[in-house]
Regions:
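Membrane-interfacial helix-loop connectors
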Residues: 1-4, 8, 25-41, 181-260, ...
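Transmembrane helical segments that form the transport core of multi-pass membrane transport proteins
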Residues: 94-229
Length: 309
């Protein structure tokens, strides 16, 4: 499950904005939807190394189990696999469409006022719920409601579905988002004066902070910082022009190093909670950190040498 978190919950989501929230933030600020396909070489490089490591670890564990007499029982017929609830694919498409619309609608004239700002509902002070964001929220909630109401309860029971993991992650990350705001505000105010001008510097700074401050707002802070450095060549966003190599470094730092801790990315803790509920032993917070330092950090050092120097 640790390597599942490494590869599926984090690194594997780098190819589109719907794969990981940091890239969605970039999409909403003018980065083309399919630009992140540029990260495919980095993804393949990391995936091959980590899958190779996993293969040898798994083979060693398998041989040890066989030596201890823990052989698989092949005398019983295998479990027949059925796919039920296929109509939920419709609701999944609704959610994907909502995410894509959240990045495309703000660029349309109908959603902008005379000053060029995105129209919305002012909540308090300078906080505004934009109409594209409202449409996204409504579409996702409608899809979730329809899925919940139209899916047979027996399917959820057989899948051992509970609200426990969702509740645990929601409470934890509400606390993280509240307590991280001062640190993010300091970074936003002083980011341009940090002296970060090289891709590898952005990769490691974005990544290290993403490990503990959640990768989505951290990505946005450093994308804003890069856009304010005054570059004239690269990707043009609403935050400024960012060199392609630096944009790749920020994107990979946020997405990949969100895997360094359970709190670097919400799905990490979700996987841990679901695993715990189903009796699968997972490392503690610092135990997981030891896994990531042992296996991920050396890979990220190789990333630096190959892609970001």
């Amino acid at each position: 499950m640790v390597f599942f978190i490494f590869l599926i919950s984090n690194i594997g989501g780098c190819l589109t904005p719907i794969g990981d929230p940091p890239l969605l933030m970039g999409f909403m600020r003018g980065i083309p939807f399919f630009w992140s396909l540029h990260l495919l070489p980095v993804l393949l490089f990391n995936a091959v190394i980590l899958l190779t490591i996993f293969y040898f670890l798994d083979r060693r564990t398998y041989r040890r189990d066989i030596a201890d007499g823990l052989k698989p029982d092949i005398s019983k017929p295998g479990t027949e696999v059925h796919i039920l609830g296929l109509h939920n694919l419709i609701f999944l498409v609704m959610i994907v469409a909502a995410v894509i619309l959240s990045g495309t609608l703000p660029g349309m004239e109908a959603f902008r006022d005379a000053e060029g700002a995105v129209r919305g509902i002012r909540l308090f002070g300078e906080v505004t719920l934009t109409y594209p964001a409202l449409i996204e929220i409504v579409m996702i909630l409608v899809a979730a409601f329809l899925s919940f109401k139209t899916t047979n309860v027996e399917i959820r029971r057989k899948n051992h579905f509970t609200w426990g993991a969702i509740h645990e992650v929601a409470v934890l990350f509400i606390g993280i988002f509240i307590t991280m705001q001062p640190a993010l505000m300091i970074l936003k105010a002083n980011g341009a004066s940090l002296g970060l001008s090289k891709p590898f510097e952005m990769f490691w700074t974005t990544g290290c902070l993403s490990s503990f401050l959640d990768n989505t707002p951290t990505y946005l802070v450093f994308l804003t910082t890069a856009g304010a450095l005054g570059f004239t060549e690269g990707m043009t966003t609403i935050l400024g022009t960012v060199p392609i190599a630096m944009l790749e470094a920020i994107s990979c730092g946020a997405v990949f190093m969100g895997a360094n801790t359970y709190i670097g990315n919400a799905p990490n803790f979700m996987v841990k909670s679901i695993s715990d509920e189903n009796g699968i032993r997972m490392p503690s917070f610092f135990g997981y950190l030891l896994w990531s330092v042992t296996f991920l950090i050396p890979v990220f050092l190789l990333d630096t040498l190959v892609f970001f120097l």
